[in-house]
């Protein structure tokens, strides 16, 4: 994949070259997107809109730490949707990991979550966030146990992941109507990089074949059901719904 690669870390240790080789990224000085290594983290920038700033994964501080400490915990909609109960913490495959927010919430509640991400740039951002999270004194011990990353296409990986998860979680990219600053910023940067998940409908059947207990699909409240398949089971919030599907027998 071609992207502008910039090293602003000041370290001069060749880390960016190693990263590019690992994720098979080719430097393109004319690319509209830049992957930038700063002294703090790896971040993604939209070069023609510098005011948007950089997108990066941070499990240790900021919004994710606040959600972990002060969010709804097991009362969060995503926790209810995957079926967390007293004494039951499902094993989850998040097949559309993105920036890992929902996966992190589930991991913080005690679920073991395997994240799938097919875009190499997004996978590199996730890997960088995990590396810093694993090294953190407070969250590192349980994060290493509960949250891992697999760089692979969900369409192919869902057919051969072992062991089978209890739950497959899907949150395909869908155009957002909301104009909140964060959504607007992230969606503009992300859609410039990966576009819409046009093959997302094809994920539902392999997800239902893989999952032992259920498949959960997060959708904006105005979006049609994935693959046009309605389900009577859902957890609803003000702006989203989590459609719940039974597994298919193999």
Curated annotation (Swiss-Prot):
Catalytic activity: guanosine(1516) in 16S rRNA + S-adenosyl-L-methionine = N(2)-methylguanosine(1516) in 16S rRNA + S-adenosyl-L-homocysteine + H(+)
Pfam families to which the protein is assigned, alphabetical: SAM_MT
List of residues binding S-adenosyl-L-methionine: 101-102, 117-118, 153-154, 171
Keyword Cytoplasm: yes
Molecular-function GO term, any one: rRNA (guanine-N2-)-methyltransferase activity
Domain of life: Bacteria
EC number of the protein: 2.1.1.242
One cellular-component annotation, GO: cytoplasm
Principal EC category: transferase
Compartments where found: Cytoplasm
Keywords of this entry: Cytoplasm, Methyltransferase, rRNA processing, S-adenosyl-L-methionine, Transferase
Gene3D superfamilies, per database record: Vaccinia Virus protein VP39 (3.40.50.150), YhiQ-like domain (3.40.1630.10)
InterPro entries from the UniProt entry: 16SrRNA_methylTrfase_J, SAM-dependent_MTases_sf
PANTHER family for this protein: RIBOSOMAL RNA SMALL SUBUNIT METHYLTRANSFERASE J (PTHR36112:SF1)
Family affiliation: Belongs to the methyltransferase superfamily. RsmJ family.
Described purpose of this protein according to its UniProt entry: Specifically methylates the guanosine in position 1516 of 16S rRNA.
NCBIfam families, per database record: PRK10742.1
Name of the featured protein: Ribosomal RNA small subunit methyltransferase J
Taxonomic lineage of the native organism: Bacteria, Pseudomonadati, Pseudomonadota, Gammaproteobacteria, Enterobacterales
């Amino acid at each position: 994949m071609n992207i502008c690669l910039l090293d602003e870390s000041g370290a001069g240790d060749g880390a960016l070259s190693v990263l590019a080789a690992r994720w098979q990224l080719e430097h393109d000085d004319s690319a509209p997107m830049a992957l930038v290594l700063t002294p703090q983290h790896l971040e993604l920038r939209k070069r023609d809109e510098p005011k948007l700033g950089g997108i990066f994964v941070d499990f240790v501080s900021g919004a994710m730490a606040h959600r972990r400490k002060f969010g709804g915990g097991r009362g969060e909609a995503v926790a209810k949707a995957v079926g967390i109960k007293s004494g039951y913490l499902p094993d989850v495959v998040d097949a559309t990991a993105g920036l890992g927010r929902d996966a992190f919430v589930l991991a913080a509640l005690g679920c073991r979550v395997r994240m799938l991400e097919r875009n190499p740039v997004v996978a590199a951002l996730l890997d960088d966030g995990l590396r810093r999270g694993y090294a953190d004194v407070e969250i590192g011990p349980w994060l290493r146990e509960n949250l891992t990353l697999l760089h692979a296409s969900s369409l192919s990986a869902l057919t051969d992941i072992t062991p089978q998860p209890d739950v497959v979680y899907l949150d395909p990219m869908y155009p957002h109507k909301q104009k909140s600053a964060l959504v607007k910023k992230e969606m503009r940067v992300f859609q410039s990089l990966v576009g819409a998940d046009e093959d997302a409908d094809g994920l539902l059947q392999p997800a239902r074949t893989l999952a032992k207990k259920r498949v959960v699909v997060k959708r904006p409240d105005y979006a049609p059901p994935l693959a046009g398949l309605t389900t009577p089971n859902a957890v609803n919030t003000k702006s989203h719904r989590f459609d719940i599907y039974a597994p298919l027998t193999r």
